[in-house]
């Protein structure tokens, strides 16, 4: 069904599969999804029931449903989060991973009011700090050891292990002050106990990006990997670049996490030119970054494409790669009997001015344009975010355009 109420079979026609494996070519195909949301047939000119809903892909690409590994969607529970509907299916994203908006003290609310009602699949990294991002940066969640309750974190995970995929630590002096790298060490210990990955936000030192990488292990995630902040850019320090390159090769996941302050065109282009690609592309979408400069996942993907990240790698970075972090199987995703979970999109010629987190401007001449998110038997019409007129607003760091 197309954003409807009652489930009907869904016939998707004239789409080109990508990122489903070598057995699928560039030729177009049709996909029939049953009322129960599982794929019932794949091929050309399929016989479909009389009551079928039809979506004509018009030659668009179809991939596994896009995964955004870093968003903030505890709307109403934090002062920074947006609604899942603002960055999910209506933007072509079928899986959203909240990056530490909730801590152990309020995760139950996030589960009840955000995860359970949402049509998108929602997973979460649990914030190491008990309060999460209730009053983001105004009331930092990791000021000292009193902000961390190990026993309650373990209890929270035990009660919500189907939703929590890891531990999140923000390692930046804006949050931790002079506490440095200690929260990262504590977070890593807890992640080891729980046998889950840790995602670490790197930013204004301390802690140093170098120190963080030395603590992480295979499967862990460093988000904001291509930030342009002084003292935290991999392109201003050859030793740091070499360390990041080595850690990436050893299985530490470099995640974009664009956000309002954490992505640089110059850093990304230089790193990719030297062969260091991000493992995953994510937005760090929240109320202070959506309207400017991030917009959505499709635009963020387009930014990486513009700095010469290959098309196939861009798609992998929003499907298979982030899915592996949250233990979401992508095996045989386009097979009869599998639940339908797709993004239908075009890659179009464009001439769009886009800005990174440092204020540097680039023109995007190729754009990912989401058309539909397919979740079970429902095809939700999708599009990129169209920014509103910006205004100068005051916030925890001073003033900025939003």
Swiss-Prot record:
Q: Which UniProt keywords apply?
A: Hydrolase, Metal-binding, Zinc
UniProt-recorded Gene Ontology molecular function terms: carboxylic ester hydrolase activity; deacetylase activity; hydrolase activity, acting on carbon-nitrogen (but not peptide) bonds; metal ion binding
Q: Does the keyword Hydrolase apply?
A: yes
Q: How is the cofactor bound?
A: Binds 2 zinc ions per subunit. After heterologous expression, a stoichiometry of 1 zinc ion per subunit is observed.
Which annotated residues bind Zn(2+) 1? Answer: 70, 72, 168, 284
Q: List S-S links within the chain.
A: none
According to the lineage, what is the superkingdom? Answer: Bacteria
| Site residues by UniProt (Transition state stabilizer) | 170
Record PTM N6-carboxylysine, positions in chain: 168
In short, the EC number is 3.1.1.-
List of residues binding Zn(2+) 2: 168, 201, 224
Q: Which cofactor does it need?
A: Zn(2+)
List the Gene3D superfamilies hit by this protein, alphabetically.
Answer: Metal-dependent hydrolases (3.20.20.140), Urease, subunit C, domain 1 (2.30.40.10)
Q: Which InterPro entries match?
A: Amidohydro-rel, Deacetylase_Atu3266-like, Metal-dep_hydrolase_composite, Metal_Hydrolase
**Annotated function:** Esterase that catalyzes the deacetylation of acetyl-(R)-mandelate (in vitro). Can also hydrolyze acetyl glycolate, but with lower efficiency. Has very low N-acetyl-D-amino acid deacetylase activity with N-acetyl-D-serine and N-acetyl-D-threonine (in vitro). Theoretical substrate docking studies suggest that other N-acetylated amino acids may optimally occupy the active site and may in fact be the physiological substrates.
Q: Which family does it belong to?
A: Belongs to the metallo-dependent hydrolases superfamily. Atu3266/EF_0837 deacetylase family.
Name of the protein this chain belongs to: Deacetylase Oant_2987
The record lists the organism as Brucella anthropi (strain ATCC 49188 / DSM 6882 / CCUG 24695 / JCM 21032 / LMG 3331 / NBRC 15819 / NCTC 12168 / Alc 37)
